[in-house]
């Protein structure tokens, strides 16, 4: 492919609304253009990267026994009403009506459609297991779309759905997809981790996220160096290693704390550390009030609380609700005498008996509170966020926190959708059984953005070879010289013969412009050809990742190039 015939509208500056590195570079490199909020046009260069990522996904899915199909993006409302998600999914679900007044939605995911398909086609245990997948456009009406392809409203996704007869079969399907994902992201040349995760709005009993490691990631991951434990902080288990404290404590005392609403203000006023306080956090779970207690220097993990309650919805109580339930403004809630039936405490609060809490009274706190003596707890549970250096729940090591970008997610759905929608089969005895499901997603367009967040520098993108739009960029620095042009054409053919897709920069531009654009678009291997180099019988090869330059001989170029290319690929761990 010649640059002069290929549409690559590079820019010197990124638009003002581009915040993260990938958004800026995707636009500057001429890979995407914004159509409207959260919706982008994939330009030829960007589409090549996305299609390369999709090709790797497709190959590994097929190798794992999944079969490709394509489902409609527009889905009828009645299927979502049948599963119970029409009302539950919220405003992220873009709802539309046709001319006959029938309700539809633009698919953010396809559990309902695939379940409807399979329940109408699969009747016997002999037809199971079954794994079907698609690579297709999705739409989620994000309230604040941002970061380009990282959090857009329209995006390209691979979603697969497995159907099994029993839990053992589901385990096998899940493991096959997990291993396929490990191969997919390894083949892409990405640094990533598979982490235990919360199932979120999809539902189900067990899941893993696949995280591309990047300092700019929105997610925090906890992992152990001494074993293979990794988890999203929403899922990460907190281990209490000390024994429960049962020390005697003095009677409860009121302390006047005027206008001291926050933990920091109360600590300063009472001259105590934050670890001496209990925070009482009030929520509405499926329409009912609930209170959660954590130590003053900890953060509540809302996902853990929601899972503990088995709630579909969990929202922080409004200031009006706080006043109604406590008789006090926000900042003075406490567990003693609290008029909320469900009251849960984090496990860590077992380790002490003498606490400072809100008094459910304006400008007042309590000291010497014993949860066992002074409150009616519903129970203890792991409710807090993991922190750096917490004990590992699997071994004697400690946990470290890092940042990541979610690019894949696998779920064990169980019977969440098949039960609700009557997706059943007949077993060997002719008895009707509910199918067990799994679902497995990869953000195909997002993985390109995540790759750039992980692999870029001050000059531009640094693509891993497997998902680079082109593997090799051949720069002709002397396009007016017929001898140079002829040699460049020969080298172009030699690189193609080596099995590489190559872009030839044949533009009538200054070398400096070509070098800047070469680094910007991130092609991993650059070959620089000019009259001076050819006079010496060499071609300059540059590894975009390291910046290292190597002189390759024109005579015997094919062999020298093959050896250098192997070196570059090894540097990527490929």
Curated annotation (Swiss-Prot):
GO BP of this protein: prolyl-tRNA aminoacylation
Enzyme class per UniProt: ligase
GO cellular component terms attached to this protein's record: cytosol
SUPFAM superfamilies to which the protein is assigned, alphabetical: Class II aaRS ABD-related, Class II aaRS and biotin synthetases, YbaK/ProRS associated domain
Reactions performed catalytically: tRNA(Pro) + L-proline + ATP = L-prolyl-tRNA(Pro) + AMP + diphosphate
The keyword Cytoplasm is assigned to this record: yes
Main location (coarse class): cytoplasm
Similarity comment: Belongs to the class-II aminoacyl-tRNA synthetase family. ProS type 1 subfamily.
UniProt subunit comment: Homodimer.
Full protein name: Proline--tRNA ligase
Organism the protein comes from: Oleidesulfovibrio alaskensis (strain ATCC BAA-1058 / DSM 17464 / G20) (Desulfovibrio alaskensis)
């Amino acid at each position: 492919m010649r640059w002069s015939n290929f549409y690559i509208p590079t820019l010197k500056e990124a638009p003002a609304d581009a915040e993260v590195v990938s958004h800026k570079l995707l636009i500057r490199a001429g890979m995407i253009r914004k159509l409207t909020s959260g919706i982008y046009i994939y330009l030829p260069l960007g589409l090549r990267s996305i299609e390369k990522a999709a090709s790797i996904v497709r190959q590994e899915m097929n190798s794992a026994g999944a079969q490709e199909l394509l489902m409609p993006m527009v889905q009828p409302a009645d299927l979502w009403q049948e599963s119970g998600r029409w009302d539950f999914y919220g405003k992220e679900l873009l709802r539309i009506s046709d001319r006959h007044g029938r309700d539809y939605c633009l698919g953010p995911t396809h559990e309902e459609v695939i379940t409807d398909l399979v329940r109408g086609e699969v009747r016997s245990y002999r037809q199971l297991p079954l794994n079907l997948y698609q690579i297709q456009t999705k739409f989620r009406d994000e309230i604040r779309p941002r970061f380009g392809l990282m959090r857009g409203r329209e995006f390209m996704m691979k979603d697969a759905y497995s159907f099994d007869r029993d839990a053992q079969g589901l385990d096998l399907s899940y493991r096959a997809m997990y291993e396929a994902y490990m191969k997919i992201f390894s083949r892409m040349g990405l640094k990533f981790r598979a982490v235990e995760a919360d199932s979120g709005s999809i539902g189900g009993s067990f899941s893993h996220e696949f995280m591309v490691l990047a300092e700019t990631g929105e997610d925090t991951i906890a992992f152990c160096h001494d074993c293979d434990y990794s988890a999203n902080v929403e899922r990460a288990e907190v281990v209490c290693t000390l024994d429960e404290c049962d020390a005697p404590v003095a009677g409860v005392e009121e302390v006047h704390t005027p206008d001291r609403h926050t933990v920091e203000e109360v600590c300063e006023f009472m001259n105590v550390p934050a670890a001496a306080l209990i925070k009482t956090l009030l929520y509405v779970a499926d329409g009912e009030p609930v209170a959660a207690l954590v130590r003053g220097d900890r953060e509540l993990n809302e996902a853990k609380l929601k899972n503990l309650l088995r709630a579909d919805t969990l929202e922080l109580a409004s200031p009006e609700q706080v006043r109604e339930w406590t008789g006090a403004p926000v900042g003075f809630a406490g567990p003693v005498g609290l008029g909320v039936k469900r009251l849960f405490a984090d496990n860590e609060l077992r380790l002490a008996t003498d606490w400072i809490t809100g008094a459910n009274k304006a400008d007042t706190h309590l000291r010497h509170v014993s949860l066992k003596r002074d409150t009616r707890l519903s129970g203890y549970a792991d409710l807090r966020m993991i922190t750096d250096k917490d004990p590992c729940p699997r071994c004697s090591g400690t946990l470290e926190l890092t940042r990541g970008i979610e690019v894949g997610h696998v779920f064990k759905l169980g019977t969440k959708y098949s039960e609700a929608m009557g997706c059943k089969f007949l077993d060997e005895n002719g008895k009707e059984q509910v199918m067990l499901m799994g679902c497995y997603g990869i953000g195909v367009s997002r993985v390109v953005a995540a790759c750039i967040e992980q692999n870029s520098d001050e000059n531009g993108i640094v693509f891993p070879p497997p998902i680079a739009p082109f593997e090799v960029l051949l720069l002709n620095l002397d396009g007016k010289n017929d001898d140079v042009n002829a040699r460049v054409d020969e080298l172009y053919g030699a690189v193609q013969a080596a099995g590489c897709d190559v872009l030839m920069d044949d533009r009538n531009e200054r070398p400096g412009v070509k070098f800047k654009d070469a680094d910007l678009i991130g092609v991993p291997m650059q070959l620089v050809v000019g009259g001076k180099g050819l006079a010496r019988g060499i071609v300059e090869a540059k590894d975009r990742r390291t910046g290292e330059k190597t002189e390759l001989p024109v005579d015997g170029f094919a062999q020298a190039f093959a050896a250098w290319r192997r070196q570059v690929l090894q540097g990527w761990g490929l």
